[in-house]
Swiss-Prot record:
Species of the source: Homo sapiens
Subcellular location: Nucleus; Cytoplasm
Lineage: Eukaryota, Metazoa, Chordata, Craniata, Vertebrata
Residue spans of the Kelch repeats: 87-154, 155-198, 199-260, 261-319, 320-364, 365-403
Protein name (record): Kelch domain-containing protein 10
Gene Ontology biological process terms in this record: positive regulation of stress-activated MAPK cascade; protein ubiquitination; rescue of stalled ribosome; ubiquitin-dependent protein catabolic process via the C-end degron rule pathway
Predominant cellular place of this UniProt entry's protein: nucleus
Residues with Omega-N-methylarginine modification: R13
Gene Ontology molecular functions: ubiquitin-like ligase-substrate adaptor activity
GO CC, one annotated term: nucleoplasm
Family affiliation: Belongs to the KLHDC10 family.
Segments for region (Disordered): 1-57
């Protein structure tokens, strides 16, 4: 078999560059608790307008909160809270985000609307070459000034958080598929500095729309597209030796997962699970999922169990996925016909699908989502209207587990004393706050 035949067996050519940030581009475009405490917080969406970072001490008149109820899912909507001339991150799609206890970090993105994307002030239009953080305790958006070289592949890259470091791999610039990346860029969020990770071995192809995870000290990258060719390749980067290896599973080609992009992955330490994804012309089912066994170096096909009354989740791509222990949550996405607004949970021990009672306030795809260590998921941005090619800058949060007593008390404290972050560390210690909580204020 020739090298070209081997390439074609694992990849398929499309008719045009795959979209990296939504419609209008390319052919396709914890701690949980027990008992009843805090159950009112569970599976309820809250929309967060967020305050921009404002220098100085200007007083701001806050508008009252309005409550709306959609079916059985109450949603708190907070109206525009901004001074004229200030705003949070513009609407975008194709970006990525991660979260720790203190901040949501949002990187990159795409918006072809000239005015929405910043107009003449955005040198990288229609992309966003910027890093934002949303501070949970104060509700403040802040665009981070960083040193070093920030990557220019700003749509459909992969992003993970490793300690204080953001690891970015792949992605595409404009036009989609014409300026892809295959480097690993690292940003230390404490020191606000970017660096290029020097690696050995054969790197993956220049791709975007791949999925990535860190497992046992190694970075695993699966799938993706060049814009025209879709991949089933699986690569591993040892973060200690910084050496890339392309894994060659012990499977026949017919037993490999279908080539895809804009899928998501989950893992349990032994297997990597591939969830959804597709190509410009299809979206893959979630009835059966492929799993790569790290111990046997082989792909396995796993039949999942449907919801008793509803069945399986719809096939989708461009969705989001977060994981809490052995529970995986997917939300939103696009099935080739409609934008989805549902949320599903898959248990990696039973492989049972459960549909959550909450519905996303805005069905969306090409959005990003991240979950905090305490189990609160944040969803930002994405495409909300295919025909109008419309994006959103909305930020929502939803508790996926019952919040701990500490988290409930913390949220009550922040609501009662919104200026708590303005106090000195000494004052906060005198009030009885722990060092851990004080760090979450800074």
């Amino acid at each position: 078999m020739s090298a070209a035949q081997g390439w074609d067996r694992n990849r398929r050519r499309g008719g045009g560059a795959a979209g990296a940030g939504g419609g209008g581009s390319g052919a396709g475009g914890g701690s949980g608790g027990s008992g009843g405490r805090g159950t009112g917080q569970l599976n309820r969406f809250v929309q967060l307008s967020g305050r921009p970072h404002l220098p100085g001490k200007k007083k701001i008149r806050w508008d009252p909160v309005r409550r709306r109820f959609i079916q059985s899912c109450p949603i708190i909507r907070i109206p525009n809270r901004f001074l004229r001339g200030h705003r949070p991150p513009p609407a975008r799609s194709g970006h990525r985000c991660v979260a720790d206890n203190t901040n949501l970090y949002v990187f990159g993105g795409y918006n072809p609307d000239y005015d929405e994307s910043g107009g003449p002030d955005n040198e990288d239009y229609p992309l966003f070459r910027e890093l934002w953080r949303y501070h949970f305790a104060t509700g403040v958006w802040h665009q981070m000034g960083t040193d070093g070289y920030m990557p220019r592949e700003l749509a459909s890259m992969s992003l993970v958080l490793h300690g204080n470091n953001l690891l970015v791999f792949g992605g595409t610039g404009i036009p989609f598929g014409e300026s892809n990346g295959n480097d690993v860029h690292v940003c230390n969020v404490k020191y606000k500095r970017w660096a290029l990770l020097s690696c050995r071995g054969k790197k993956p192809s220049r791709i975007y729309g791949q999925a990535m995870a860190i497992i046992n000290g190694s970075l695993y990258v699966f799938g993706g597209t060049t814009g025209y060719i879709y991949s089933t390749d699986l690569h591993k980067l040892d973060l200690n030796t910084r050496e890339w290896t392309q894994l060659k599973p012990n499977n026949l080609s017919c037993d490999l997962p279908e080539e895809r992009y804009r899928h998501e992955i989950a893992h349990d330490g032994q297997r990597i699970y591939i969830l959804g994804g597709g190509t410009s012309w299809t979206a893959y089912s979630l009835n059966k999922i492929h799993a790569y066994n790290l111990e046997t170096n082989a792909w396995e096909e796993i039949a999942t169990k449907p919801h008793e009354k509803i069945g399986f989740p719809a096939a989708r791509r461009c969705h989001s996925c977060v994981q809490i222990k052995n529970d995986v949550f997917i939300c939103g996405g696009y099935n080739g016909e409609v934008i989805l607004g549902d949320i599903w949970k898959l248990n990696l021990q039973t492989f049972q699908w459960v549909k959550l009672p909450a519905t996303m306030p805005e069905p969306v795809y090409f959005h990003c989502a991240a979950v905090t260590p305490a189990g609160c998921m944040y969803i930002h941005g994405g495409v909300v209207n295919i025909h109008e090619n419309k994006r959103t800058g909305s930020l929502f949060k939803i508790w996926l587990v019952v919040p701990s007593l500490l988290e409930l008390a913390w949220e009550k404290l922040l609501a009662a004393f919104p200026n708590l972050a303005n106090l000195s560390r000494t004052q906060l210690l005198h009030l009885g706050l722990t060092q851990g909580l004080i760090e979450r204020l800074k």
